[in-house]
Amino acid sequence: MPSQFFGLTIASSGLSAYQAALNTTANNISNEQTKGYSRQAANLSASDALRVNAKYGSMGSGVMVNSIKQIRSEYYDTKYWQNQASLGLYETKLGYLEQIENYFIDDDTEKGFSTILNKMFNSLDTLTHPAGDTNVRQQFISDAQSFMTYFNSVATGLGQIQDSVNEEIKSTVENINAIGKKISLLNKQINVIEVQGGYANELRDQRALLIDELSSIVPTEVSEVPVTNSKHPDMQTGANYYTVKINGQKFVDTYEYSELTCVARKNTINQSDREGMYEIVWADTVNSFKAGSDSSSGSLKALFDIRDGNNSENFRGSIKGVTASTITISNPSITNVNAMTMPAEGVLTIDGKNYNYTDFTFTTDADRNVKEYTFTLENQLSSDQQAKLDGKQASIGESIDAMGVPYYLAQMNEFLRNFAGSFNDIMNSADAKDLNGNSTDYFSFFTGT
């Protein structure tokens, strides 16, 4: 006769197993609003059967809970992290581009470029009627000052945006380092629990949430590989190697992580750049992180695009001649004098190596297009260095395919140089006279600093 206690044991196992499953469901419901929480499930299996002296040979002994694990898909995690970088890139760009756009608003509530320019030319047109009226002349001068004040104000505002982005780059790097530290600590806590046979659901959720955040900042790759017994490769210890790569470079290696640091540039790259723009390097090797490269993405890439974006219009050319103290460059990318964006002193990059220059001159053809630039170097070159540089490609800054602050400032500078130059040429023409009928030769109405 079957034991009644055996039947009670089977029933008890069922009650216990489904009580655990019910508690797991309650836990899922309770954490419905918990950020980063993954749904958990109780994994059930039949208990070991008992051998019996009967025709059927064995009898089931009930049910047992093998584990309670989070339900996550590695495939969807990977896809999500890959697309997070693109989301972070465009969200960050959108925020700053809207700020830039605000400086060019021209409507009933905010007077912008077109309105101010039209007002100045209307005043100029008024001068053609009572040309000797000093009040009319003064009104034109006032409107011209307003026109210049507008551009100075926009330039100041764009510079402030560049400063703001630069500081956000620094705070973002600090956040990346903090995330790396947290992930490395969580890796250790998770392995301590799981090497003893448990499963660290909540800690894994915390780690995945950190990866979610990190992947929106920089392109992120994650790898988790079981640690096996060195003497028995098929035997897993329960621990895992967990590595994280950002921008294709190892960032977290299980319990260790590498820090990034910001280093201020010693020279400006663009003529209108603010001082102290940051570059990102690895703290241990001082190698460049290249957050703004074309292959990168994420909110950090967006910050570099806004701060340094030049629409791929940086200075480039071929080295035609080299002396101990100068480098002459022909076939330049910038042939219009008014379109020059290079700082008076800065850095030439040739074959990945930097050469500081203290000054430059240029020559033009009959059409006033620049043919060659000659840069005066800060440090003299040896004869071997001169021979190696001849015929190489040179550039100032990087070619960044984005319309950021440097691009808009360069467009403004080029417009103002052309406008002021044309206006001053008229003022210096042979027919130009002042109020007293005197020639206005060598008189510049618009000047720049």
Regions found by a protein language model. Give the residues of each.
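Structural signature of extracellular appendage/secretion-system components
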Residues: 1-449
